[in-house]
Swiss-Prot record:
Pfam families the record matches: HV_small_capsid (PF17086)
Family recorded in the similarity comment: Belongs to the herpesviridae small capsomere-interacting protein family.
Primary location: virion
Alphabetical GO biological process terms: viral process
Gene: SCP
Annotated compartments: Virion; Host nucleus
Signal peptide positions on this chain: none
Protein name (database record): Small capsomere-interacting protein
Keyword Cell cycle: no
Superkingdom, taxonomy of origin: Viruses
Lineage of the species this protein comes from: Viruses, Duplodnaviria, Heunggongvirae, Peploviricota, Herviviricetes
UniProt keyword list: Capsid protein, Host nucleus, Virion
Transmembrane stretches, start-end: none
Organism: Human cytomegalovirus (strain AD169)
Length: 75
């Protein structure tokens, strides 16, 4: 017999946090979370790890906009 308790796995918890960041914190459509843009993937991963710091949702929104804008500017 194994001592594993039924419940969410680490991957499920991570996916749940990811959906929370997209839908609640950033207020983005679900389609955005499935986008393959490298900046979105990187920033969503970063925000998911920072899940305890969501006091100011506007700061996260502005940070994401800034990172997308920086990535799109030509040098």
């Amino acid at each position: 017999m194994s001592n594993t308790a039924p419940g969410p796995t680490v991957a499920n918890k991570r996916d749940e946090k990811h959906r929370h960041v997209v839908n609640v914190v950033l207020e983005l459509p679900t389609e955005i979370s499935e986008a393959t843009h490298p900046v979105l993937a990187t920033m969503l991963s970063k925000y998911t790890r920072m899940s305890s710091l969501f006091n100011d949702k506007c700061a996260f929104k502005l940070d994401l906009l800034r990172m997308v804008a920086v990535s799109r500017t030509r040098r």
